[in-house]
């Protein structure tokens, strides 16, 4: 991602007049520019798929008991989401502009300082030149901060050693990383590259929005403003609350709730490997997130509104109430 981004930055201009045409120029005139651009855009999607799988794996096997590692992971998730959001603004298409307008506007819900804060971030009275330039600057610097944080993430993991599916100590079963884990990891990497190259070479625009191929027009709002697929679940939660501040809080909490999970762990066992009821709830949570992702991409009308509201309630209910109670029930089941 950093490499493709670097090569894109060599040809990109962060000025409102030329940003859109510079991206077009990259795709048409730069040698393999189309490849670099689509590797970067779809690489972000693959990145998020990996992140979601990684977080899900951590939830399932109780890896969140490594507090420092887990909290840095949550911080990393926020940083990656911020980076992806700012990157989406750079091509300066319709969805870039209106996405930036809608999401930055959410900050105006903050009491007292809200509207000043939004204008400060915009660098004016609307999303304009100053906004695009600073988003480019932040989009360039953040991945390096993320890389550094990932190093710290690993540092704290190595303090404890990694977890395993059983949730038990595996010190006695340790084997050399190379060749065993290296060869195992190469398989996953190859599968990942296969999916990425298939996406890039066969249907590069599958996950994108056609509205972003229309240059910015501040006077014309697209019929359905929606983010990239990996933000749709959070967007659905945001939209399911009629109050602006409430929606913003729910949006932040939808990710921040991950930080509370270690304190909601009531089970005597670390992993869900031997806890069938918790497993069931975990997969309901996955289904619920897929439902939210679907709802986030739908227009705000019946029956999508009520489905989104129910899915949002279920999301928080599962994590904050049902899973901890089920864990206690399972403890009693085993007479612990």
UniProtKB/Swiss-Prot annotation:
Pfam families listed in its UniProt record: Cytochrom_B_C, Cytochrome_B
Residues annotated as binding heme b b562: 40, 139
Organism of origin: Sorex pacificus (Pacific shrew)
Gene Ontology cellular-component annotations: mitochondrial inner membrane; respiratory chain complex III
Transmembrane segments: 1-10, 34-55, 70-90, 135-155, 183-203, 245-265, 277-297, 304-324
Binding site for heme b b566: 54, 153
Function, in words: Component of the ubiquinol-cytochrome c reductase complex (complex III or cytochrome b-c1 complex) that is part of the mitochondrial respiratory chain. The b-c1 complex mediates electron transfer from ubiquinol to cytochrome c. Contributes to the generation of a proton gradient across the mitochondrial membrane that is then used for ATP synthesis.
Binding site for a ubiquinone: 158
Name of the protein described by the UniProt record: Cytochrome b
Gene from which this protein is expressed: MT-CYB
Cofactor: heme b
GO biological process: mitochondrial electron transport, ubiquinol to cytochrome c
